[in-house]
Amino acid sequence: GILPEDKPFQTKSIILNNVYEKESELGVSRIISGMNFANLDVFIDGEKITEQNVSDWKQSLNMKTAAFETSFTFKDKAKITYTIYALRNIQYAGYIDINILPLKNIKIKATGKISTPEEFLKPLSTFRILKDNEVTMPILQTVAKSKFGKHTIGTSATFVWHAINSGREEQRPHLTHDKVSDYENHLSFEKELKKNENYEFAWTGAECSTQDFEDPQTESERFVIFNLLTPRNDLIDQHKKLWDDLWQGDIIIEGDVQSQLDVRLALYHLYAFSRGDSNLSISPMGLSSQNYNGHIFWDTELWMFPPLLMLNQDIARSLVNYRSDRINKAKEKAINFGYKGAMFPWESDDTGEEATPAWALTGTFEHHITADVAIAFWNYYRVTQNKEWLITRGYPMLKEIADYWVSRSVLNADGSYSIKNVVGANEFAPNVDDNAFTNGSAITALKFAT
């Protein structure tokens, strides 16, 4: 997830989906904010472009094409537009497409940067020009360990020029490498531009980790090389085509423009934070920040899942499969607490173990999450009628959850059953008996299993 900033050529952070590291020595897991390859410094006639020396500032999100566009005028010298893409087709890569229209003859300098968080360990920052026969591939790269060494993260980046063959060294501008420090790795070029002649180029980067790759360093290089040597229109058109496909699942509201924008923004974020066939889920903040540690809560099953189930069943399947892929950890948790079946964590990460901080009673007592999972599973089958999925994933999950609730319930003297000592949907009311939401969702889960 690339989070833009309201400053020229700046982004706040890049969040790495499903990549976790401990937040502190005694803390729980937290989603990683990775190296930032999406910042540039651009100079015109020796002066750096900043928010203080531009006018006609405008930023907009094109939800249809998933493109974040910024435009402005730098003094009386140039009109500049750039567009940030978190590429849907190259899911580990981003692409910043830049257009400069000189209002007079000018000289530009563009510096692309890889900035490594200070908490990362032993960054190795390099610049190399790879070569295959006559094709040359300039690669700026940093490789480092995450905060406590759980993951190796590799980030690569390079410039792309649209009017030339970027793989030909004799055609592209001279590149200058500046390793400011182990944590700041820069690559620059300069170019003289003539009045009213558009100049177009891009900065593209990719970031990979050992969560997904044995060799994240080399994989990040491959993605960048692909972007370097693929014509821009082909690359961006494929990205747009995939977003066109996503928007086949739309909600149209007539006569209320603001409500239409609000609903589409919500859908945009659901689509941007998820992917069909990934078997990953969505945290409350998606990929916009490290809030909630990037963990998966009941928010997914109860609020995010229903619209996706109706509008994009490939993504909906990924969300439920995320849970079934972690059913063994849920079964272990049930055993550890003296129950049968599967008991899901209140906060889940890549492992499927409980990831809630120990001080939060929700992690120990908010058990309705297990029923919420069952409700989502049965609803997926009811809508899709996918019997193969029901046999391999759906019913095994419903049975394990039913077994859990049977073992979790306590028989009363009058023949009724109670579920005691829980945190319900109201997280500020801990250690209550027969919470309405918990009991109701458990009853629903048991009915769905029969």
Question: Predicted regions span which residues?
Answer:
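Acidic/polar, glycine-enriched structural segments that form the non-catalytic walls/loops
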Residues: 1-292
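Beta-strand segments within the central parallel beta-sheet cores of soluble alpha/beta enzyme folds
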Residues: 81-82, 111-112, 317-322, 335-336, ...
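Short, hydrophobic/aromatic alpha-helical segments in well-folded domains
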Residues: 95-99, 139-152, 188, 283, ...
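Inter-helical turn/loop segments and adjacent helix faces that build the functional surface
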Residues: 108, 211-218, 250-254, 310, ...
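The feature captures the catalytic groove of carbohydrate-active enzymes
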Residues: 288-296, 342-392, 400-450
